[in-house]
Amino acid sequence: MNKNLSLKLAPRSKIDGVIKPPGSKSITNRLLLLSSLCNQSISLTNHLISDDSKYMIKALEDLGVSISSDTKDKITIFGDPKKFNNSADLFLGNAGTAYRPLCALLSILGGNYRLDGVERMHERPIKDLVDSLSSIGADIKYLKNIGFPPVQVSDFKFNGKTDISIKGNISSQFLTSLLMAVPLIGQDFKLNIDGELISKPYIDITIKLLKLFNVNYINHNYSSFEFNCNDNPKLYSLDSGLIDIEPDASSASYFFAAAAISGNIRVEGLSKESIQGDIQFLEVLEKMGADITYNNDSIDVRKANTLVGGQFDCIAIPDAAMTLAAMGLFTSSPLELFNINSWKVKETDRIVAMENELRKFGATVTSTENSLKIIPPANISDNVSVHTYDDHRIAMCFSLACLANKSVEIQDPECVNKTYPNYFNDFLKLLS
């Protein structure tokens, strides 16, 4: 990847057309991991092909899992945790959806595993997850800074403790990692959540997929989860060997937003019944004035007569909230986002990054540890060069600025390879 590259987006005034974004990153990486735990072959269609999913696939292959790409849109996993290699050196880039779940899984399976990533991964906290796993007998050592990757995972010595606690207000990936891994202990178990649970819709994805894989649990209103793993011969098995993955709702948010700003878009493959939390972004767009139509297998968004601002709780849509922030350049009144503290531990500190880049376009921006307020500019600045911080979502959300009929330069556009390698090609085809 050449980080010195940039992409110049010409001034545009409208977006129009039909698009089907690639498969959901959150669903793809969860399914890859869960499929590797099944003693059967499982095929996934419409899976995401991106840096994050490639890191997960490579790690699973390094662990001894056989994975074949049958066609461009279909992949088959031949899993069995009993056949995992006893040692491996895994490099996981900046893929939190791979690093954290694999850390939990391998610490319970036991063995000799080193988990590393890029420099930004070394800054993303993992201490709460490690502390929870260590409390039941996991042996995890920090190789550089305490509380952060890289880590070394060694043999698991289960101490008989049948409950575990995890903080809910740091990252939902910690809870997701435990939810997918603790059933491997093979006995009844309880997971307790301390404090408020952020990004709850991402937990909903996890528990719905666990049900699919015959993992039995009781959800006590998201304050705790009880697993019933004794005498469950179907644990980590799938009744059907084929799963079709729905398009990524976070990736769809850029097209939904573009239409609300200036145009008409139909996104295929998604419906109101999507299991992804970012589908709730459409409710925000409706409040801002956009016209939304839900079809059986597609969603239409049409331009708002006036795109209004407002105050929005983003706890359920942390990724789509990035798109919402970029829309603050176009609103007729101030836009305020709150409950976005999870932004600080993502690919970059997104609160700082968004504040910096929005100001380049002329917006007045203030922030706290948990909120961002945007007062739109009277005139959006032309020829702005957007620094993307190696963050795919910053690159994609600021592409919307060209719809102000302004030129926009996106630095390091290939950072979108993390979740949507063809984003700019797809976006440009729809512009007029």
Where are these regions (language model features)?
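Structural preference for solvent-exposed beta-strand-turn elements
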Residues: 1-432
